[in-house]
């Protein structure tokens, strides 16, 4: 089997009631606003008629595919390891995000060729995954605008069945307000719900990170993630922070690549390791990170929701929660369009069962069917490689 053609459609969809924060870059709740979001729909065609599909990515990843798209033509689509290493070298001067946009549909293609879900190819066994509610950033527009609002939403999520809840705080934060919020959420849900905090690298100083971390200590949080404006990449800074607080750190969302992830973990910069199938070389790259992390005796936590993440998590032992990201008490938006699916697959606040879990799609490949009519109706740009 050989790759004959690759097509990437850029489709745009409206995201309602969200806008960029005026003093930062977070998407925050703003009633009446509309924000255009893009999705990159990839199809990899072969000479035997098998097609691999995936919708996701970002503009940086799509631009990088231009650097290796034609190299893929004529290649065996099952030789993912060869493709991974060749493309990794080609993108060595860049962040390598383009790798994931091609690797994921190659796994979908393999699953479709053999008539099994990706998790079966990976030796996976899980059929349901425990999820955590990962909030949108804090706003000042009547949504997540106070400690009480975060606490009330945590209770709502617990009642829906979520076993864990992660806060993303305000761009215009105040340390005492963040500290109050950390405590208020714990007081509201009690001791039997895992809680996490992700400031999204917003805290201005290391001192603020220490103050917030010690509040997490007092409230018994499971982890603190990407606290301050080093942007999550300072091994020395996070190693020192680990020495000053008890709450485990979850880092490496903003560190690219297998070797860099493991250097960060071995160097003592984190307790949990973050991996992302889109950011870290696709399913192939994220799986390498998961296995290497397992060899260190640590857990890996996958970033963001989606069918690729579900197939991957179903195949990894050393992982805890599926991230149901961008949930909000007054919106069904999750930061990416759900209109791309044709088969009822969805992510979002109410996408979990009463057991607090999401199902792993059991169809071939990624296990989902895309609505290509809807995608093409929203397409604004197409690239092809032959």
Predicted regions and their residues:
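Glycine-rich, aromatic-flanked loop segments that form ligand/cofactor-binding clefts
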Residues: 103-143
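Conserved, mostly hydrophobic/aromatic
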Residues: 49, 68, 102, 115, ...
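Flexible C-terminal active-site loop/helix
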Residues: 2-11, 15-18, 29-31, 37, ...
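Metal-dependent enolase-superfamily TIM-barrel catalytic cores that perform enediolate-based chemistry
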Residues: 128-245
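Metal- or metallocofactor-binding catalytic centers and their adjacent structured scaffolds
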Residues: 5, 45-114
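Motif-centric detector for short Cys/His coordination patterns
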Residues: 1-41, 57-62, 69-77
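Shared catalytic-loop signature of beta/alpha-barrel
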Residues: 22-23, 79, 214, 220, ...
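Ligand-binding pocket scaffold of soluble enzyme catalytic domains
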Residues: 36-38, 42, 47-51, 113-116, ...
């Amino acid at each position: 089997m050989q790759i004959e053609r690759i097509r990437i459609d850029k489709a745009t969809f409206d995201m309602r009631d969200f806008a960029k924060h005026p003093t930062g870059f977070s998407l925050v709740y703003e009633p009446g606003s509309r924000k255009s979001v893009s999705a990159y729909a990839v199809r990899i065609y072969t000479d035997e008629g098998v097609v691999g599909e995936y919708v996701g990515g970002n503009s940086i990843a799509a631009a990088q595919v231009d650097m290796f798209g034609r190299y893929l033509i004529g290649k065996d689509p099952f030789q993912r390891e060869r493709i991974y290493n060749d493309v990794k070298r080609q993108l060595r001067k860049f962040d390598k995000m383009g790798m994931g946009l091609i690797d994921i549909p190659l796994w979908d293609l393999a699953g479709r060729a053999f008539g099994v879900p990706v998790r079966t190819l990976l030796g996976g066994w899980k059929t349901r995954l425990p999820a955590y509610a990962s909030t949108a950033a804090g706003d000042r527009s009547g949504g997540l605008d106070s400690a009480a609002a975060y606490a009330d939403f945590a209770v709502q999520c617990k009642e829906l069945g979520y076993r864990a809840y992660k806060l993303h705080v305000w761009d215009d934060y105040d340390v005492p307000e963040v500290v109050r919020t950390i405590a208020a959420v714990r007081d509201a849900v009690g001791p039997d719900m895992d809680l996490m905090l992700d400031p999204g690298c917003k805290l201005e100083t290391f001192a603020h990170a220490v103050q917030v971390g010690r509040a997490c200590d007092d409230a018994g949080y499971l982890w603190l993630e990407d606290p301050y404006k080093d942007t999550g990449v300072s091994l020395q800074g996070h190693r020192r922070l680990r020495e000053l607080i008890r709450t485990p750190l979850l880092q490496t969302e903003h560190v690219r690549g297998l070797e860099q992830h493991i250097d960060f973990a071995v160097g003592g910069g984190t307790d949990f390791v973050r991996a992302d199938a889109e950011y870290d070389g696709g399913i192939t790259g994220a799986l390498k990170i998961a296995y290497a992390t397992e060899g260190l005796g640590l857990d890996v936590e996958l970033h963001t929701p989606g069918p690729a993440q579900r197939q991957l998590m179903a195949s990894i032992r050393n992982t805890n929660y599926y991230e149901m990201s961008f949930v909000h008490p007054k919106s069904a938006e999750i930061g990416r369009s759900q209109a791309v699916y044709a088969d009822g697959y969805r992510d979002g606040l109410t996408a979990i069962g009463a057991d607090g879990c999401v199902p792993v799609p059991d169809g071939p490949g990624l296990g989902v069917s895309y609505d290509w009519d809807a995608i093409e109706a929203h397409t604004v740009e197409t690239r092809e490689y032959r």
